[in-house]
Amino acid sequence: MAGRGKLIAVIGDEDTVTGFLLGGIGELNKNRHPNFLVVEKDTTINEIEDTFRQFLNRDDIGIILINQYIAEMVRHALDAHQRSIPAVLEIPSKEHPYDAAKDSILRRARGMFTAEDLR
């Protein structure tokens, strides 16, 4: 029998997280820790960074989605993440469009391939 798949975690504003929760990604692990964080105006950078690091260390999470404007707040933590799993993807929010120039993970991925590799 196949094992359980990996979860998607999300760190974002209320609209983003609610959308993903309505899509069915919300889970609690065996320790009753959720796989999401709603970032509000009173959420501290330390809370965001701690949650991000907790998601990195959970073996049940395969992908972490984070609003790009929130990723900017903890860029040093994202840049320090070198493993391929969990994959970290920066996504837009309703108020903040995606800017590929700010996505350090995308820049790193682009450096892994040459133009020949993509033909």
From Swiss-Prot:
Keywords: Cytoplasmic vesicle, Hydrogen ion transport, Ion transport, Membrane, Synapse, Transport. It is a peripheral membrane protein. One of its GO terms (cellular component) is synaptic vesicle membrane. Expressed in brain (at protein level). One of its GO terms (molecular function) is proton-transporting ATPase activity, rotational mechanism. Belongs to the V-ATPase F subunit family. This is V-type proton ATPase subunit F.
